Design a protein with these regions (language model features):
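Ribonuclease/tRNase effector modules and their secretory precursors
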Residues: 1-143
Length: 143
């Protein structure tokens, strides 16, 4: 699985200066979480393709919110609770010729657990939603 290459890495969320690590539990949770299992169609495809941009998604995340741990099964892995951050990512839409026609932009929530070792670990990406007003063309990236 693509995510395994990130295990052990860390990124700083620029808006908060939080260091977020990629733990060994991310690949399994990302692929098989309750949220992932509910996804269909374009959102399922978006989550699968978003995996390759996780380092960048962490760096640009903002709007941090804290939530206490509510499930006993997470007492150890999220001893100090959870943080969620808003992030964005873009996926190309291709023409029949294979050229990129435009990019679809998605908004998502990064779910981060605050573990017993006092580190923050990315746990899952959730609430993926296409931003209907945000499309940009390939040439927008070069200007």
């Amino acid at each position: 699985m693509y995510l395994k290459q990130y295990v052990g890495e860390a990124r700083i969320i620029k808006s908060t200066n939080d260091m977020v690590y990629i733990g060994t539990d991310l690949p399994e949770e990302y692929a098989h979480s309750n949220y992932t299992n509910t996804l269909k169609g374009a959102n399922a495809k978006a989550k699968a393709n978003a995996a390759q941009g996780i380092p960048e998604m962490l760096m640009i995340a903002d709007e941090r919110e804290y939530e206490k741990n509510r499930k006993t099964k997470h007492i150890k892995d999220a001893k100090y609770g959870w943080y969620s951050y808003v992030t964005r990512f873009a996926l190309p839409v291709y023409e029949e010729t294979g050229d990129i026609e435009r990019y679809n932009v998605f908004r998502a929530i990064l779910l981060v657990r605050h573990a017993e070792d006092k580190r923050l670990y990315l746990y899952d990406i959730m609430k993926i939603k296409k931003e209907t007003s945000t499309h940009f063309q390939p040439e927008d990236l070069t200007q």
